């Protein structure tokens, strides 16, 4: 049985997810909570295998909560389930160790399958989010790209040549 904790500030969402996931033979919803602080308290009592985590919640948001959970309980998998797909949320959630980032438009069948895959060690990212992630990492790679330069030859370049090199480097 895969033990799941649902964290969402909207009661209707918590109840709906609990009903939907409760129909799965291999998934047990061990509890529902409304914010990140309640997640921490719930995890201290009984460790879930997977946490379905909303991003925007009162008291403590899903990104900060994900960071704390992964630092203290690295074996617990976190799937961010949210309506928000802005770059900062996506980047930070994945940076702090979320195993999945899914948008709430996902079907019940897809969500159950995502929980199973994440439980078994696979990362799950919504297709639209995957495109954003690739673009983000591409931009990061370009910014952090460093090359080795022969200092002796580089000292001979004129200012105009440096200008051309800089422009070529920027693409």
Located regions from the model:
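Short hydrophobic/Thr-rich beta-strand motif most characteristic of the beta2 strand and flanking loop
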Residues: 26-34, 42
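Active-site T/S-Asp motif of two-component receiver
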Residues: 53-54, 65
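Active-site beta3 strand of CheY-like receiver
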Residues: 46-52
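Active-site residues of response regulator receiver
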Residues: 8, 54, 82
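Short, flexible helix-to-coil linker/hinge segments that flank and couple to helix-turn-helix
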Residues: 89-95, 105-154, 163
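Acidic catalytic/metal-coordinating carboxylates
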Residues: 35-38, 61-64
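Receiver (REC) domain active-site loop signature in two-component systems and cognate sites
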Residues: 57
